[in-house]
């Protein structure tokens, strides 16, 4: 995990919160659309679950298909994307277990949190920033991992 932001889809939580706060006024002016409803949250969870399933099968093409357009432009190919996740984000690449936590929004940004147990039994929280596409589907725009002091039992 880097400590600086270079348009990376996976960044530290502090950077995510700072960027969301800075963009709050632009977001408010840009969209008056209602927040996600129960059906949206189910679709968001489905998207995240399917991407993690694809990571576990090393299915780069499918995993990449759940990434938002900005992420796809940055990594250009499914294999570049999978390589980045494999080397830097093993918690979501090969989780031992995960469970969805309560979702929330910050300044209009939709965030789904997951509690993730890593292969070495560390507990982490993954924050997925989701982006609604023009066709109504949800894509993953960013993810950040936050370590927990807890260990899995």
Predicted regions and their residues:
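Exposed beta-sheet edge and beta->alpha loop/turn motif
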Residues: 102-153
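Short solvent-exposed beta->alpha transition segments
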Residues: 34-35, 42-46, 50, 60-108
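Charged, low-complexity, helix/coiled-coil-prone segments
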Residues: 26-31, 68-74, 129-132
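Generic detector of short, well-ordered, non-transmembrane alpha-helical segments enriched
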Residues: 24-25, 59, 126
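Juxtamembrane and targeting peptides
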Residues: 2-55, 108, 139-140
């Amino acid at each position: 995990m880097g400590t600086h932001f270079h348009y990376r889809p996976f960044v530290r939580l502090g950077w995510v919160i700072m960027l969301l706060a800075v963009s709050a006024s632009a977001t408010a002016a840009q969209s008056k659309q209602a927040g996600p409803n129960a059906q949206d949250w189910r679709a968001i969870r489905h998207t995240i679950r399917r991407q993690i399933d694809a990571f576990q099968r090393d299915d780069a093409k499918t995993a990449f298909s759940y990434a938002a357009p900005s992420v796809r432009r940055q990594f250009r190919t499914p294999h570049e994307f999978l390589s980045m996740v494999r080397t830097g984000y093993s918690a979501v690449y090969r989780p031992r277990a995960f469970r969805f936590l309560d979702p929330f929004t910050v300044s209009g940004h939709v965030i789904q949190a997951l509690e993730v147990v890593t292969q070495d039994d560390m507990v982490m929280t993954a924050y997925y920033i989701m982006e609604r596409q023009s066709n109504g589907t949800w894509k993953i725009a960013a993810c950040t991992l936050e370590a927990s002091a807890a260990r899995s039992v």
